[in-house]
Amino acid sequence: MKTDFLVIGSGAAGLSFALKAAAHGHVTIVTKGEMNECNTNYAQGGICSVTYAPDTFEKHIHDTLVCGAGKCDPEAVELVVRRAPELIRDLIAWGTRFDKTPDGRFELNREGGHSEHRILHHEDLTGAEIERALVESVRKHPNITVLEHHFAIDLLTQHHLGEFVTRHTRGLTCFGAYVFNEETNEIETMLSRFTIVATGGCGNIYSSTSNPIVATGDGIAMCHRAKAITENMEFIQFHPTSLYHPAEKPNFLITEAMRGFGAILRLQNGEEFMDKYHPMKSLAPRDVVARAIYREMTRRGEDFVYLDVTHKDPDSVRSHFPNIYEKCLSIGIDITKDWIPVTPAAHYCCGGVRVDTNGQTSIKRLYALGETSCTGLHGANRLASNSLIEAVVYADQAARHTASLIDRTDFQEGIPDWDFEGTQHTEEMLMLIQSKREVQSIMSNYVGIVRSNLSLKRAMRRLSILFEETEELYNKTKPNRELCELRNMIAVAYLVIKQGREIKESVGCHYNIDYPKQ
C-alpha cells in the first residue's frame, strides 16, 4: 500500500502530527496495540507552558538547562519553550480540558526542578485527557486511516534495493516500512513519501518501569537498524516515586505534582532525608531524588521509602489527586491518613534518535518524534512535564517541514515484498519470555540508577550472548510480535550500555561510581 504520511505510533506526538499533516495528504497511522495504548496515556503530572506572570520564557529556559546538566541543546530548549503556548492552544482546540480555578484561570502546578507554577493539568490524568482528545479528533478525520494491531518491523531504505549502506552513506533515504499485520499474520510493504516514527520509550528493558508493556523501544531500534544516528541513550530517567506494589506491572506512578503540592519523602523510620542531598529537598530534580532514595534504600537494605501527604487538607488531596487516591485505596492505603510506599522505576529515555529542529533524522524523509527522538531538549536529565510539550511542538515542526516538501517527493518503486523463504513459525514462546526477563534482569542489575565500568562491561558481555541467540532464531523464524519486541529490546539495551561506556563522567541520569564527581 501507499500513503503520503506513514505514522508509526499513536501517542501525543504521532497523533498531533497526523492531525496537522492530514491537511496536506493522506495519513496512515499504524500502532501495535490499541490506539490509546501508549506512554502518553500514563502521563499523570501535566504539560509545561509559561502561562501567567511572574513566570517567563527565560525562567523556563533556565530551569530546563539547569536540569539538563549542561547537555541540553540551547536551540531546542528555546524552540520548545517559546512555541509552547501556541501548541497548548492547539490541544485545547482539539478538545483537551485543562483544570481551571473558580475565577476561570488555568490551575498551574509546580514540580521538581521548576522555579514557578507552570504545569497545566487535568486532575492527575493529564496524559490520558490529551490522548482522549487526540484520539477522538483523529477518528473523526476523513484523511486519516488508523491500523491497530499492526507492528512495524523494519524501515525501508536503499538497503532493500540491494545497496550497501552505513551511517555515513550520503543520501540515505527512508521509503516506508515493513509492517506485521497481527490479524492476518502477513507482513505488508507500506510505501510512504514521509515516515514518522513516534513509538514512545523503552522502559520495559528494565524490570521495574512506569511504562506500559508496549514500551519496548521499537522505534529507536528500527531507526538504529536503518542506520540512523542515536545519542544520549545512557540517560535513562528513573522516576523517584512509583507505588511500591511488587505484584503489579507496570509500576503505578505517584506524580511529581504531589511533591509540588507539599508531600514529603521519609525513611521507613519517619525521618526526612532529602535535605542531606539538595537545597530543594523533595522538590529536587528527578535524578537527584532517585539516587537519594536508591542510596537510602541500599544503605538500610529496604525496598521502599515513604511519601507523606497526610499533613495536607484531605479534601484538597482527594480533589487534586483523585486517581492516585482511588488506586492507593484499592490496596488499603488512604493517602490522607497513611504514608505511601514508593520506589524508583525506569520512566523516560532522555536520548533517542537524533533529530534536527524539524524532527528529521540523519536519514532523509524519516522523522522521529516524542520519546523516540533526541531533540536535545532534555540533555542529561528531563525536567518534569517537559516531554508532552516537546512531543507536540516537534510534531508541528515536522508537519510544517513535510508539507513544504510533499509536492516534490515521490514514492520509491522496486521495493521487494518480505521474503519468508527458509523460515517457519516458532514454538519457542517460553524461551522468548525468558529472554525478555533476562534483558530486564541485566539492565536492572548492571545498568540502573547507579552504574560502574565493571557493571557496564558485564552487562554488555551478557547481552551479547542474548543478541546472538535471538538473531539466530530471528533468521529462521517467521516474525511475530514477541520475537520482534525482544529483538528491539536487545538493540536498545545495547545502545544504553554502549553509550554509557563511552561517557567518562557522571552527569544527570548517568551516574558511574568510577567517575563520582558531578
Language-model-detected regions and their locations in the chain:
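N-terminal Rossmann-like FAD-binding beta1-loop-alpha1 element of flavoenzymes
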Residues: 5-29
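Conserved redox-cofactor binding core of oxidoreductases
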Residues: 93-186, 191, 198, 242-245
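Glycine- and aromatic-enriched mobile tails/lids
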Residues: 1-3, 12, 20, 34-36, ...
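FAD-site-proximal beta/loop scaffold in flavoenzymes
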Residues: 154-166, 171-184, 333-377
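Conserved N-terminal glycine-rich FAD pyrophosphate-binding loop of Rossmann-like flavoproteins
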Residues: 33-65, 69, 237, 248, ...
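Core beta-strand elements of the Rossmann-like FAD/NAD(P) dinucleotide-binding domain
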Residues: 1-3, 185-194, 362-363
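An anion/pyrophosphate-binding glycine-rich loop and adjacent beta-alpha core
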Residues: 35, 222, 228-335, 340, ...
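Short beta-strand to alpha-helix junction loop
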Residues: 72-85, 118-136, 147, 209-217, ...
